């Protein structure tokens, strides 16, 4: 075995992505899902596919596991731990969910619940997710309540500068 092919040079990290999905309203709610294989309650998340962009993967996982369309808002953070003797890195994004479901939930999920932040933290089975949601949850809910920001449109390269409405054009 050459150094280039030895196990020490192979990235054995499991890369996963997910979201803290928030439904806005008078009382915002956070999605938690129950897996069928072990009945554990977790934040919606899953493995990143080969060559998949992490944001697309996170959106896909949340839609598959909750059945709700979501808008990805911002990156929130990372949880890292050992899973089956391999390092696992889970990246989370804040997502705004629509009011009603649009899709069927995947068969690996037996239940989806939209809970208050305190109830979601209490329901989670994974201690690392509990700590993560405790630390970032209030921020996520406040950010999810904000109205969407319009993206600034940049002028084309070489275009003249935009005139302000109060400037007069001289002939």
Predicted stretch roles:
Residues 147-171:
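Intrinsically disordered, low-complexity charged/polar segments
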Residues 38-40, 120:
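A short, flexible beta-alpha/helix-coil linker loop
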Residues 24-27, 36-38:
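Short strand-connecting beta-turns/loops that link adjacent beta-strands
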Residues 48-71, 75-135, 162-171:
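Unchanged
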Residues 1-18, 24:
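Acidic, metal-coordinating catalytic segment for phosphate/diphosphate chemistry
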Residues 32-34:
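Short, acidic/hydrophobic/Gly-rich beta-strand patch recurrent on exposed beta strands
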Residues 42-45:
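A short gly/proline-enriched turn/hairpin at secondary-structure junctions
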